[in-house]
Amino acid sequence: MDTFKRWLNKPKADDKSLLARFFHADRSLTAVASELDSFDGRAEPDRCTRLVSRLRQNQDKVLAITNLIMEELLGEDRDPRAFRAKFPEEVLQENLAGQLWFGAECLAAGSSIMNRETESKEMRPLAQAVTKSLGNVRVLLRDQCLKNNVPNSKTLHLDLNDSTTEQLYESLKIFDRLFAEFELSYVSAMVQVKSRHEYEMQQWIGVLFSETLQRALKIGLLDQEMVDAFDPGLMFSIPRLAIVAGLVVYAKGPLNMDMPGDQLSEMFRPFRTILIKIRDLLRNLNNQELYQLEKLLCTNEDINTKVPLGSSSIEAPSPEHSAHPTTSSSQNNNNSSNNNHSSSSTTTTTMGTTNTHRTVERLVDQRNNNHNSNSNSSTNPTVEGATLRSPSMLSLSATSTPTASPAPSPTPSHSIDSTSSAATSSTNPPADWSDGDDEDEDDDDIEVDEEDLESSDDDTDEEQLLKDIVAADCASGYLIPNTNLGNLLQPQEVPLTDNFVASEDDEYGTAEQQGHQGLEEEEPSTSAAMLAATRTLQRLRLPSSDTEPLAEPTTIKATEEQMQQPNGRHQESHSHSHRHHQRHHHHHHHRHSHQHRQPHPHRTTRSGRKRCSLEVADPETIQPEREQNLASGDTSAASSLSDDVSLAMRNTTARLKFKSTENLLHRLFVCIAGVADQLQTNFASDLRQILRSVFLMNMSSAQEEIDIPEKTKESELFEFRASENDVIQESAGSNQSIYSAEEVNPELDNVFSAGGGNQATGQRHSAGASMQRNNTIDLASQSGEGSPSGATMSTSRSHVTRSRSLGDQEAASSATSSTAQLRQQEQQQQLQIQLQRQRNNSVGSNTPSSASSTSSSSEQNSPVSARSGSRRRLQSNNETQMPSSATSTSATLSPPAWIPDGKAPRCMACQTPFTAFRRRHHCRNCGGVFCGVCSNASAPLPKYGLTKAVRVCRDCYVREVRSGMGVQGVQRVQSVQASAS
């Protein structure tokens, strides 16, 4: 009996209820599965392939209907699937459920995923549980189809008191949970799924992109219209700009290259090495160079070499400082065999800055391995007893010692603004390094002559040590060329440096800094290394020696006058070598014979880094202080500053490899664009998702609907001014500007009488709102036949309205009917005859009409008088004659005002949105806004005084222009042309 009821309740084929649809889909799936089991697939591969395709389609269909049933029965009790947010877009397809079911059956049968044997073994128990649970759900749903199906019902009608219904409910919950777990495991094994950290890093990348876009909008690199229009070019510009901003502007953000590689976002992890190199080069750019690079990344235009770069830009070294890489090894061998000294004693001129320039130039030669070319450019080589103000000199080579190993990048507050230090060595005025009381003893402090240097040539180890000394060894103080630097003269509590891009307002630097640096650079041929040293050390922050109680804080006491004051004595710089024995793990302090009279001590650290002090101390306290410093350990501040200088050395050395700033910017553009463009290929899904979020966050509010008025109001006319070129070219340098041109508007003619005298007072009337400017001409009309001087005159005022240019009117006007046009033309002809009579009768009289004719004659030079040119020529020619007939004058109407561009974001014909490439075009006949395709027609408009062909839309061309160009239109145009000739 129960079987008979089931047969009677079997769903029909046309039943659209959920249970009926599941019943038929399940039967079809069972039939395909039975057919697959009935033959050997290896014997008939084609048939097997077709059946497998049908099987997967039926599985998709069954699971889709099952999902709908679970949505209705379980509702909020369904297992969450928030993990799908981490899946790539190409994985989230409609047939994902069918693929998962097919994969679960394969794994349950003993198969393994290719190259995923370990994951397959781990997922096999879960796959077996999924297939078993799904089989149980299918059986229970088939039973419900035969018992509780309501034909064509949109909802399920199950018996809640039945045990099978409760069993179905629990089975669906179990299957939903197992299937969700299997989905996450299977997809994670097949494709790379982001972890929680990686997903958060991708969100931070999105924040970086958004901040980059807002910064680009603020400094004018991009336009808001491009964001609102979803300009495709932004898909390339934003990632490029984000790389620059992430490496320099937001150095502690998601593109912080100092963090471990596994903590970087997977999008930029493959490019970590090249990004570090890009970051080092970007830190050598000043603000203007950085702006040029960002503009180049946005527009792909050529670098504008005519625009002067910032004052901190480094030029290529002079040819005398350049070295050929192929000869470096041979030069090193020659230097070691000939025992040539790496740095020689140089007697400089009286100016300390000249000493500095040549010293650093010699260091550049040393970096380029030009040891054979010693700097002998001193002006007085035989001067004896010169004072040595800075006996310590640092090598330029950043790769010769272990101290130049890659160091963590400084924080943004200690970052390097424009260029990094190449070398530090100088001879400065006495106020820098000694007290005023000891100035008389400076000549006897240290005596250096050529014999001292010749004696040192015998020591090969000392020569090697001179090559190995780097600028990073100087930790507590610097010997800085051109110490007349504003930042170094500030107190220690004042920061010496800002962020790389502290603010967009300080984009190009101040003119005072550039002028100050120009005064400092007295020698024209200043080397690039000297500029690098000066500007980098100007940015570096000297660490406070709080951890050293016996060492007073480092200070520099000097004034600007002392910095720029000539020494008066010739100075010599002598290299002071330090010996570093790594094998015995101790340090030997190589001292000069006269070193006890040096005004600054040397301190040796445990790590082998030498530290130079800028302290001004008495000679009696130098020796105990040196001993105390030798006993004290190294501090973290010294190590940090040593890393800063080491990083500065590497950065400047890398920049000096480029021939020019343009070459550096071009190389950076190629590298940055290459990385950003590879993101489009390797991480297309993630990049699209990030850019979509960025666009939605930064787009402006929804624009208002287009409000096109049905009838033009004269108060809504816009004022448009002609360009300067139009005034210059067409006015031919006339003193009468284009704004003096006037045109009569018959639609606004309101004639009214005013009490007269011998002369009517002229008044000017301006009708309209703030966006319109109307010019009026006061006209005097005689009453009767009396003379203009004796008879009473009635002054009539006609409003004269003229648009400021032929192509810039913005409001919409509906075309008037043919009868209204004829009536207006007749009125205008009558008014024209009356005006001409008045002007002929008032020739030579002192009336407003003469002023009117004067203004009209001056208007002939206006470039926009083409509409009423024939009428104005008739007025000037017929100054003493009456026109023969009224038909010889052409009646012109006021052209329609144009719709503003802001109120027309789409074409009014095809509704296509306007973009940066799809421009707006206005129809001269109706004033509407159209694209170039919908307004490609052109025709003359005699009714507006436009005898030449102008742009009109297609509708106006078909409906009005062609229909209106009948016999009257042709005769009107011919008459206008004849009168003009």
UniProtKB/Swiss-Prot annotation:
Keyword DNA-binding in record: no
Positions with biased composition (Basic residues): 576-611
Residue stretches of biased makeup (Acidic residues): 434-462
SMART domains assigned: FYVE (SM00064)
CC per GO annotation: early endosome membrane
Segments for region (Disordered): 308-462, 561-642, 749-897
Domain of life assignment: Eukaryota
Stretches with biased composition (Low complexity): 326-356, 369-380, 390-404, 412-433, 630-642, 811-866, 883-896
Composition bias, Polar residues: 760-791
Matches recorded under InterPro entries: FYVE_LST2, LST-2, Znf_FYVE, Znf_FYVE-rel, Znf_FYVE_PHD, Znf_RING/FYVE/PHD
Residues that bind Zn(2+) 1: 907, 910, 931, 934
SUPFAM superfamilies per record: FYVE/PHD zinc finger
Amino-acid positions noted as binding Zn(2+) 2 in the UniProt annotation, renumbered to this chain: 923, 926, 953, 956
Gene3D superfamilies: Zinc/RING finger domain, C3HC4 (zinc finger) (3.30.40.10)
MF GO annotations: zinc ion binding
Keyword check for Ribosomal protein: no
Stretches annotated zinc finger (FYVE-type): 901-961
PROSITE patterns: ZF_FYVE
Keyword line: Metal-binding, Phosphoprotein, Zinc, Zinc-finger
Residue(s) carrying Phosphoserine: 544-545, 805
Function as written in the Swiss-Prot or TrEMBL entry: Negative regulator of epidermal growth factor receptor (EGFR) signaling.
Family, as annotated: Belongs to the lst-2 family.
Protein name: Lateral signaling target protein 2 homolog
